[in-house]
A protein has these predicted regions:
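Charged, gly/pro-rich active-site loop segments
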Residues: 2, 77-140
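A short, Trp-centered hydrophobic/proline-enriched beta-strand micro-motif
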Residues: 11-23, 69-74
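Hydrophobic/aromatic beta-strand elements that line small-molecule binding cavities or substrate pockets
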Residues: 32-35, 61-62, 91
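Amphipathic alpha-helical interface surfaces
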Residues: 7, 56-63, 100-103, 107
Length: 140
């Protein structure tokens, strides 16, 4: 699925998104993530920020391995409710264990703190969109 330029622009201007995964026992999990859009896919790296367990045991990793259907959302809130909007990307996630320099470089450009982290060899979540829902007056 091709992501429109309008949606790409909004994705590229947002620094936080939320990823929803579901376990094989249908237990949902939503977490905030750093992300980029590249070639109509969403990417997030399993970086080296402090974690209480090894990366391969993270709930999102286990959920993706057992159920690759995910949902990803960015949104905008304002006290003027006519300005509210969201973009929800539903898709299939996969874990990539080989570095993709274009993804790593774009993540470092978007999130300068990654310059001080060794992220080149970290696993990457790749979301391939199957549908996109958007809501808000800006889209009408």
């Amino acid at each position: 699925m091709i992501i429109s330029n309008e949606i790409k622009s909004l994705l590229n201007s947002h620094t936080i998104g939320h990823l929803a995964t579901t376990s094989n026992q249908n237990i949902p999990r939503v977490i905030p993530i750093c992300f980029i859009e590249l070639d109509s896919h969403i990417y997030s790296i399993l970086d080296k920020k402090p974690k209480s367990i090894p990366v391969n045991l993270l709930t999102r990793v286990k959920n993706i391995e057992s159920n690759p259907s995910v949902s990803f959302i960015i949104d905008y809130y304002d006290d003027d409710w006519k300005s509210l909007w969201y973009i929800q990307v539903n898709g299939t996630a996969q874990l990539l264990y080989k570095p993709i320099s274009q993804v790593v470089n774009k993540l470092i450009h978007k999130y300068p703190n990654y310059e001080n982290m060794d992220i080149e060899n970290q696993p990457i979540i790749k979301i391939s969109p199957t549908s996109i829902n958007k809501w808000g007056e800006r889209f009408t």
